[in-house]
Amino acid sequence: RQLFWITGVLAFFMSPLADNLTTALVLCAVVMAVGSASPKFISMACINIVVAANAGGAFSPFGDITTLMVWQAGKVEFFTFFALIIPSIVNYIIPAVIMSFFIGNERPTLAVENIEIKFGGKFIILLGVLTIATAVSFHNFFHLPPVLGMMTGLSYLLFFGYYIKRNENADKPYDVLENIAHIEWDTLLFFFGVIISVSGLGLIGYLELVSQFMYTDLGATNANILVGILSAIVDNIPVMFAVLSMDPSMPISQWLLATLTAGVGGSMLSIGSAAGVALMGQAKGNYTF
């Protein structure tokens, strides 16, 4: 039960910086290694991690792709997202408390291993934080798109990667570009296809009809609650992109509500968020639909 809470709390606080997908993958690997003898624990812990990562990512522009999209579109300022921290905590704590009653107090078997951080690993973490600071600074002070700040962060990594390659005594030299070549291109192409499809619907005129029904007939609050429910079924990224394409006239409070519901609504089903989809593959049948 302690491991259940530790991984959940870590997921909640790591997600705003590392994004919910990365956080879920890292902590799922921990749960799989420590709780391999208990499939029930792995299942509950993975659900807990997904809920925590999605809730934690809702109050940071870097916590989820949906929040990043809203920030880049200029609908909500960077520091305004932190107003969602209390709702995010509530969205994590209530499901976690309920799930904790189904977790036993057994102690996992511990394997003693000598684990060392690779050469330059700590400095790369620092570069990651510096990259986030660069993206925020570029956007707030110079009114440049955040992508320029993130690409500048990639240049930090390229320069430091060259330093590692020159100074590290390793059988296989460190190569940043080789690591980039192994990223999940299928996921990127999926998002690319979804965005093109939604843009096509907007060009034809269907999004205007949907916007009229949701934000005029139903009202902004009801519509944004519906956004959360749809996020669990369709995935939160295409839903948020559709909302941004509709561009309804809403106050910041309603944009924050849409951001929150899209982020945490994806936790209701395993296919509702990138973190949930990724863990279905990594958990090897222990975390399913």
Q: What is the predicted role of each segment?
A:
Residues M14-A18, L25-G56, I65, M69-I85, ...:
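Membrane-interfacial helix-loop connectors
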Residues F4-V9, C46-I47, F81-I86, K122-L130, ...:
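Hydrophobic alpha-helical transmembrane segments
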Residues A135, H139-Q254:
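Transmembrane helical segments that form the transport core of multi-pass membrane transport proteins
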Residues S43, I49, G56, S60-P61, ...:
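Transmembrane-helix bundle segments that line or gate the permeation/cavity pathway
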Residues G35-K40, S60-P61, F159-N169:
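Juxtamembrane membrane-interface segments at transmembrane alpha-helix termini
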Residues T7-A11, E106-I117, L218-N222:
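Short juxtamembrane and helix-loop transition motifs at transmembrane-helix boundaries
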Residues I6, L10, A52, V90, ...:
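Lipid-exposed faces of alpha-helical membrane segments in multi-pass integral membrane proteins
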Residues Y92-D171:
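Long, contiguous bundles of hydrophobic transmembrane helices that form the permeation core
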